Amino acid sequence: MLEPICASEALAERGKAVVWDVMQWGRPARAFALRFDGQVVAYLNRCAHVPTELDWQPGEFLDDSRQWILCSIHGAAYHPADGRCVGGPCGRGRLTPLEVGEADGRVHWYPTKELQPAFPD
């Protein structure tokens, strides 16, 4: 089952992310999608270091250079392409990915047993 996220044009290259509500193992959580090097990537909005949301402003996840996803609390840095920690207190951690796709001008994600829509139809 595909779940819509947004129109493709809503995700500018290395721009602001789209954030939406999900359920992780039955508990409320947030996820985000952004475009990096032409690909749409999506992750659970939770730092691998401390379970807190990453964005420093709504939808703003990338650092000033627009190269890294940066945690607003402790500065943990993650590579946008694969979510792996590249610096800071996240050690060998990584962000939890969501499988996403893009077709016909729309971005969508594939729910899993772990991550489900917050508001199913």
Region locations from a protein language model:
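Short beta-strand His + acidic residue motifs that chelate non-heme Fe in jelly-roll/DSBH
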Residues: 78-79, 87
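Short cysteine/histidine-rich metal-coordination sites, predominantly Zn2+-binding motifs
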Residues: 61-71, 85-93
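Short cysteine clusters
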Residues: 47, 71-74
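N-terminal pre-ligand scaffold of iron-sulfur
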Residues: 1-65, 79-80, 94-121
